[in-house]
Amino acid sequence: MSKVFLATIATSIDDALAYVMQAAGMPESVTGKSVLIKPNLFEPVSYTTGQTTNPALVKAVVQWCQQHNAQEVIVGEGPSYFTPAGALKGCFTKTGIAEVVERCGSTWILFDEHDYRTYHDTSPLLPQLFRISEHAFLYDILINLPVPKTHYLTTVSIGMKNLKGFLKREDKPLFHRADINKAVVELNKIITPFINLVDFTTTRHHRSGFIAAGSDIVATDSVSTALMGLNPHEIQTLTLGSQAGLGEIDLAKIEIVGEDSKGLKMHYELPAAWLEKHFPLLTITGHDTACSGCTIPLFSSLTQLADQGKTFTRPLTLMLGTATRASDAPDCLMIGDCSPKKPENCQRVGGCPPSKHEILKTLSEHV
């Protein structure tokens, strides 16, 4: 039976981590071994947004591995395709990760600066050609350190999706143009973390914060999804992952060890509800015909506005993909180049993909 270990931050992150690592039998596993820690640092934003891994947890994991005589401990990530090339290192420096790793006497690496392994015709569910960082395969132990989030394409983004950070930056959009849920499952057949530590440490959704841990990535993501207030069986990456033999999705067949999960349940807003709450005057059309080239920089820009407490003061219609029908709203904005036809009352932020900076700049004119 798969096991998932839960520990609240009652006294310190260090104590909670020590509990789940001990319960999972990790002390004997890391001794004398090389370890790669893979957090989620897709953008240079603070962990307090709930979008990137808490540097305090990264520090705790690095120190725990060092204290248990790991031969080498490295922290590595490959940020989002939509993070400008000049800002990639900022995903380490501006998030506080670089500082804590260096203080521990360890090393952080940007995958983009190192070698990649090329895959050709691996699966009909994957892009014909894509590249994975060699660092996914160089270490004895891979510790996956995701942040639990909702996502407009996969509903949730936890451990399974966090492995996309190993892809070469230019190849990441290819996974979105394919069926992303199936592609993520196929990627998880290639890269296998030794343990997954889900970072629920920010108090954004729970009063105390906690850690969920497990070696079964589907089981760990399934329990985490349930704790987010969502049904694992409604998440395609989890149902497909279970069917592919990657792990257990049935909560009745997963042993939860440690904290009582009933006291940890939260309510994460799905993207549609989040948009209605923060931008009630916003209408988005054509999103079902748009790829991530438009949707990722758009939702990232909207998140940035929401975090600043900003909203639109009058109705605004955003048109994506091949949507070209006219809008009754006094303000209309087209995103991307998919549709050659632009209604008379619309602005356009063009490009394939369009610039996040330009999208944010244009949206800011309407708040």
Identify the function of each model-found stretch.
Residues 1-367:
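N-terminal and secondary-structure boundary signal
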